[in-house]
Amino acid sequence: MEYGFVKVASAVPTVKVADCRHNAGQMAEMIADAANQNVEIIIFPELSITGYTCGDLFAQSVLLEEAEKSLEWLVAETQSLPVISIVGIPHPHNGSLINAAVVFQSGKILGVVPKTFLPNYKEFYEKRWFASALQTPECVTSICGQRVPMQRDMLFTTGNTTFGVEICEDLWSTIPPSSFLALEGAEIVFNMSADNDCVGKHSYLRNLVKQQSARCIAGYVFSSCGFGESTTDVVFAGTSIICDNGSIIAEGERFAMDRRMTVGEIDVESIRNDRRVNTTFAESRGLHSRQAVTINALPQTPSALNLTRTVNPLPFVPSDSNLDYYCEEIFAIQTTGLAQRFAHTHAETAVIGISGGLDSTLALLVAVNTFDKLHKDRKNIIGVTMPGFGTTDRTYTNALCLMESLGVTIREISIKDSCIQHFNDIGHDINVHDVTYENSQARERTQLLMDIANQRNGMVIGTGDLSELALGWATYNGDHMSMYGVNASVPKTLVKHLVEWIANRLDDEKAKTTLLDIVDTPISPELIPADKNGNIKQKTEDIVGPYELHDFFLYNLLRHGFSPKKIFALAQIAFDGEFDNATIKKWLTTFCRRFFNQQFKRSCLPDGPKIGLSLSPRGDWRMPSDATSRLWLDECEKL
């Protein structure tokens, strides 16, 4: 698939125990269905040719012979299909019986992977029938008339990705084989399983899959036995999970009475980028001496981008189910960061410029929470509203109402006269509303805040957010500067949700109403005079673009290192019906240009707590101020 995605499938057929022909027929139909959906790799449950619950029938030669014949038929039946298939079979070898995964494609068996860890406790008795891979030396084995490699450390490469296979209990071991496979280069791990269900076990299993996927920085595709297996003592729910670097992207229905196939796309490009960034991953390779063998599959032609997985248009914003948890955690990080800075500096007051906008509102709320935690009087928070040429009644009123309801000290200082004097001093026409006109107001406000902080042994609390820093939407040495920036790692789309979350937790109805009105106010620096009706004329998103788009671009550039081409393709999916292609391209180009040419502002940022992604020059993002954006802009032009 295009853009580094690999389409995979976790298949759960309805088996008949010991009826190999039936089971092979089921799998042939599902492989054909997978091919029609452009699936590149499909996995079936453990011992799927025979069924897992054959018990002592595994010792019967008639079953083992029929299993191999059915596998041979399946390989031949699907030889015209490019799909790589992974099926389970009991495989006789050198007087032992191996619980094996067979990997095949286009009529050729690529390799046999033996199960390493055989459970032999509680309801499991696998050592009664099978030998472990630990007892089976690496070798070439005969199966279905083909001579193929058999070993536990085996990688398969397709041209689009490299993958490995482990079987059921392997995942539950202290150090799963997939850990070594990942270190050797496996980007996706496939697990064929026979996990029976007990109360509470599924939740544990899901977490196990997610954790192993995250720890290995890999995709993890899990397929477990389902309907048709014997229920003499246990029940198999037919669990299917597709996990991408710790996040479940697709999950099949459990306890279904018919066969099911779960399809999803693993973002291999993102996995590769994460492994490059995480240098600990590379260092871990030195902890083991096992060497995997690599088997080449037939190259597969990438299909067009047709994702079954969703693309989140608001990647920074927690889902509704997690909103309380994450908002509380974010707010606590901001509060604790500021509290430590006050404890260290022994500053007596916090000085904040309050505009009636989202960012200064969140900064004020953080300061209030910090002072409450430190048992300091809220009156030592000095909120300064500084009306200018573009201040509207709505933001001015909200600023005053908010400060009053929170019980902080209120100061009002108009910057109009000082700016007019400044324009006279430098010879600037007050009617020319250019960058000088705008930036002089921002710098005048910052000067006032700094001087008040000096007067009151205070600390100026920065209000700028991550999105503004990415775009350089701040006046250099104006609102760009502070003594501690509590919002520096919080993107604009998240600021809005945080303020709304805090508002809904307040008992004070006046404060709550004010906060919710601030959330609904158009984003603006208010540096240009209002329109004739007194409404905001200078709207930020009309100038630099929608913050929903910019935060989407920022997340995918910083978190995944994606190219403009891939970001554009994902944005088309995420914002389908909301923004057309021309709009997305326009603002993506703007983002790339501004992200590069505004780096000089980020190179001298004040301190501030990391929340998630960060552009701090001392931490997450070390970029030269004079780097060129040519490569990124050239790609934007070709979109």
Where would I find each of the regions flagged by the language model?
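ATP/NTP-dependent adenylation/nucleotidyl-transfer catalytic domains that generate, transfer
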Residues: K7, N23, G159, C216-A218, ...
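Enzyme catalytic cores with a strong preference for nitrogen-chemistry domains
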Residues: M1-V351, N369-R378, I410
